[in-house]
Structure formats: C-alpha cells, structure tokens
Amino acid sequence: MKINPKNGIDKLIFGMKQNDVIALYGKPNRNYKDEDDNVIFAYNSLKMRLTFYKDEDFKLGYIVASSADMELFGNKIIGRTISDVKAALAQKGITKFTQEDFDTFENYFNEDNWIIFQTEFDEVVKFEIGAIINDKDEFDWKFKG
C-alpha cells in the first residue's frame, strides 16, 4: 500500500465519507465513536484505523496504520529503524521532525506532511497520517467525489 503524503494511503483520500470507504474496502471489522463523537473504522486485514471527523461532516481526516506492506516513496517503513526511514526521507527533502518520548515508544512528527512515525526499540511499529490544514486554518480536503 502506497502512502501518499498530504493525501492519504492507497485508495484512501482525505475528505472521503464513510460510504466512499465502504465502497472500496467493504464494511469495517469495528465501527465505533471516540470520546469526541468522531466515527472510527478499524480494518483488521489492512491493519488500519480511520477517523471521520464529526466537526467536518464526518470526512476522513486521520489514518493510523501498522501494515508491513506500506511504502513511502517506494520504501517499506514498518519494521525498519527510524534512522533508515529518516535517511530515506531526507533524500525527498523531509528532514524536520519533532520527537516525543513515551516510556519505550517515541513519536517522530513531521508537521509539513502531518505524518508520525511511532517507534519502539528504535524500530518503526506504527505510522499515522492526517489531513493537512491550510493557511486559512481549514482542512485541505483532497477528495473531490
């Protein structure tokens, strides 16, 4: 599955509605609401959790994924060391990361692309990507369906 910075993952494009996603991947294994009443879809086979924002008319705005099949710029990311991933990203001009530490986990956040690499024991175990917020402080929805 190809990660498309600022747009989504694979066929998932930020701004899609729940029915658009179901048309592509079928019904999710889990469907629930979080503490903010956002709708969450979880797909076991894809190893993805999708968030549809309540305040944005339930548009797809955030994806958390841990599938070993994911690729960013042609490189797999899950299971690789964060230094390898960051070196590959540097070749594409992505060099600025904010690091947060939590017990054995670290998050490496790049705000320009709204991506997070979560590591444990120096290895990428999870990837998060969110819809971009533009200069007007609004979401830049990419899906035009």
Language model segments and positions:
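Extracytoplasmic Gram-positive cell-surface binding/anchoring modules and repeats
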Residues: L12
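A cross-family detector of function-defining hotspots
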Residues: N7, M16-K59, E71-L72, K76-G145
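A short, surface-exposed helix-loop junction/capping segment
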Residues: M1-P5
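Intrinsically disordered, low-complexity regulatory segments enriched in Ser/Thr/Pro
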Residues: L60-A68
